[in-house]
Amino acid sequence: MSTITTGQIAKLLWPGLNARWGTKYNEYAMEWKDLVDVETSDKAYEEDQEMTGFGLAPIKAHGASIVYDTASQGITSRYTHLAYALGFIITHEAIQDNLYEKIGMQRTGSLAFSMRQTKENVVANMYNRAFNSSYLGADGAVLLSTAHPSLSGNQSNTLAVAADLSEASLEDMCILIGKMTNSRGMKISVQPRSLIVPIDLEFEAARILKSTSQSGTANNDINALRSMGMFPDGIKVNHYLTDTDAFFIRTNVDDGLKLFQREAASFAQDEDFDTSNIKYKAYERYSTGWSDWRGLAGSPGA
């Protein structure tokens, strides 16, 4: 168990320091909120249940009986909440002898920063692992797959041939999204909402979606993606995505990627009677995952 003592903050025990740096930087806005829908929970876990619905109605011949269809349960997605916690200990002497900002308050700010960064990484890792076969969804497939099982056969939310971010690949992805069906193969209105990219693709994404004319050509054609308003929620740059050429599209499908907040971040402190050391801790509990894979489409890049 690590403890902050006077030896670890020796410079803070003497007057004359001009500045202390390394723990106070500007932060990005909470980017994880662009990646998931947020719900609350008051249980140990949450479950989402797929229901399959009915197929097309057949022709009924004169005098023939009606064909009766059946609806059934599909996949069950379980969200088991995990606790994330971190703390630190400071000796009584280190607190009393520090000549500058109250060291407990300063370190508490660092603790809050660590908790926020943790949530950013936990949520972004669903995207970072979207093509990783070690991380499967309730249907037994990776988040972005060409082989999501359904009653009407395998379905896809990624291109058959992986492609880098371009006007053509985005158009192909939008077509793929527009052809999505439910588990029974019925047409459903799935629409792109936002384009999610790592910082490495920020400028390329802006050129593709914000140019008035077709991007990267001498043609006078319109920028169809822009003129048709294909991404009404715009470009979302996420600094926690690790693949420099992967890109993702969130859709309007409900019950896609989720974060269930079980317990909000809380902070506490206490003093040890025997040592007079002060303990500070942060604690938060939540779960992440996805139910309907149609909530996301994407490509790992070529």
Question: What are these language model-derived features?
Answer:
Residues M1-Y28:
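N-terminal alpha-helical "arm" segments
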Residues S2-K11, L143-N182, K187-S194, D200-A302:
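Sequence/fold signature of self-assembling virion shell proteins
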Residues N18, G22-Y28, T118-M126, S169-I177, ...:
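Charged, low-complexity, helix-prone segments enriched in Lys/Glu/Asp/Gln
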Residues W21, Y25, A29, K33, ...:
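Residue-level signal for secondary-structure boundary elements
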Residues T23-Y84:
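Assembly/oligomerization interface modules of large self-assembling protein complexes
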Residues G74, I90, A268:
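Residue-level signal for pocket-adjacent positions within structured domains
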Residues S77-S134, L195, Y280-A282:
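Long, contiguous amphipathic alpha-helices that act as assembly "spine/axial" helices in icosahedral shell
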Residues R129-P149:
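Charge-rich, acidic-biased intrinsically disordered regions
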